[in-house]
């Protein structure tokens, strides 16, 4: 269906256009945005969910909600920190889906590329338009052909949120090798999950409603270095560190599930 969005334009979007895993993130960001004291705000996500006009509450259970809010805050803050050090960096949101990180962290000088598979970018263009410093681009995380269209830069910052957790170990290796081969130096912000989650996709409170399953899980980001020795692990933070700030359940999960929850790992090469 079509409904007006910002600027009076219309969003021509159907429920089937959106991958199930993307619905999880969209539903959570939309519902959080609608709260009076929202910790994150994503008006575009709310517009998308409102346009679809369907019940997506099953994709918004408590723990997944808190996890997505936490990772959104953690990615945003880490990106701002890196951009403050490299204000002219080229930033690439690889596997961007409907994510709108550019508006959260833009400093007025970065160049930003939202990259995803062609079918996903085609749907994204129903929602977003290219801007002077924020461009959408077809690209595969397992094939670096697209990287030749990325301009030269003194620093590259690659964001992969909710992507690598669905890859096999071989696919993770292919992706890491591709990044290091394609860009002479850079940072990678990656979402990692545990071996426990790899084995229990169908027990996940939101993913169980999709056909998706988690791929290779790790106990530490150091395991990535075995696949790509050119990379160094700069930092690794469990989402529990953010989630425990907001609720008793979050604080309890930080204790009983400290080795289960996902992490934000930062790599450099």
Question: Which residues fall in each region the model found?
Answer:
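Conserved beta-strand signature within the Rossmann-like core of class I S-adenosyl-L-methionine
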Residues: 182-195
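Short, glycine-/aromatic-enriched active-site segment of Class I SAM-dependent methyltransferases
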Residues: 195-212
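Short amphipathic alpha-helix with an adjacent loop that forms part of the alpha/beta core around
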Residues: 144-154
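A conserved beta-strand element that flanks and buttresses the S-adenosyl-L-methionine
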Residues: 158-159
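Short alpha-helix
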Residues: 212-238
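A short, conserved alpha-helix within the catalytic core of class I
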Residues: 166-178
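Rossmann-like AdoMet
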Residues: 2-92, 96-139, 152
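Core SAM-dependent methyltransferase catalytic element
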Residues: 247-269
